[in-house]
Amino acid sequence: MRVAVVAGPDPGHSFPAIALCKRFADAGDEPTLFTGAEWIDTARAAGIDAAVLDGLVATDDDVDAGARIHRRAARMAVLNAPALRDLAPDLVVSDVITAAGGMAAELLGIPWIELDPHPLYLPSKGLPPIGSGLAPGTGLRGRLRDAIMRALTARSWRAGLRQRAAVRVEIGLPARDPGPLRRLIATLPALEVPRPDWPAEAVLVGPLHFEPTDRVLEIPPGSGPVVVVAPSTALTGTEGLAEVALAHLRPGETLPAGSRLVVSRLGGADLRVPPWAVVGLGSQAELLTHADLVICGGGHGMVAKTLLAGVPLVVVPGGGDQWEMANRVVRQGSGRLIRPPTPEALVAAVNEVLSSPRYRAAARSAAASIASVADPVRVCHEALARTG
């Protein structure tokens, strides 16, 4: 099967797309990744054919962010349709926030599937609005709270649907969006929440992780716990997390004696690194085999990767979906949430998680939930076969 996988350049979306391409290739399929120019060489080094996704640079200044997103997706669909036509894939897999891939597939009459590299974020009649971080309300007052919040957000959701319909018509598609054949929900079941209206096309397939390097960070010597700090790669992530951790987490003072600190990041400004710490880009999968605790911003990729390794968390969420993810971690029991990230709050949360076995036990329970997921490649093959 020849498949085109479309994702924007944000690592939280491009890396899962590369991971899915590798899964396709391992199964004997022929994947081609369309993504930002900054990850083309990385994908090719991993053995994946890759091409630049056209139209990623914004060209309008519409003050309505929602309208701008939909208009940009439609423009990108038209720009990228010729490259997809030349590739002639049997299937297109489009990242959930890169709607252009699905629209381009529709323009060409190619079946398409959506990749959600996080839990399902569609609104539900049984949940508070996604992003609130709230658990479903219980009792009359709790259900009333959720209903009121859903009503307050429904107007924006309906406006988005109207904007999407308008730009679809502009590029020659029907106003009504038929949606994807399947939605690949690439998360751990432990991070999902039950809903009464789970879509029939949505399938849990487990996290999709890709390591952009095979370099191994050398952990400083010591007999105490290893604390990993993984600052967010998202534009909405909390700033200064690494700096606060390096300045205030000190072995024998605010950490157990012999502790080590490892800051794992793709890049950033130079930092003053004490002798008990190391900073750089290294394989997080390898690093997590040594970790006793991870401090991160709450992006789904790092949270899921950490839980898969059975390691507990201290989450310092920024914007976007990080608040939602952080609260799900807390409710699942595998970590603590702090906001704002004051030095005192960070030190207290780190020491509580390190000293209490229940956090690691919950993380291991989350890791075990992977046993119930489906194979994303098989899901794609079976969905395509049903189209005849």
Sequence positions of predicted segments:
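Conserved nucleotide-sugar donor-interacting segment of glycosyltransferase catalytic cores
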Residues: 71-143, 190-192
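Short, polar loop motifs at secondary-structure junctions
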Residues: 35-40, 96-100, 188-192, 263-270
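Nucleotide-activated sugar donor-binding and catalytic core shared by glycosyltransferases
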Residues: 1-9, 15-32, 42-47, 86, ...
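Conserved catalytic-core segment of nucleotide-activated headgroup transferases in glycan assembly
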Residues: 194-269
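Generic beta-sheet signal
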Residues: 34, 53, 115-116, 186, ...
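Short gly/pro/ser/thr-enriched loop/turn and capping motifs at secondary-structure boundaries
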Residues: 39-41, 57-60, 119-125, 129, ...
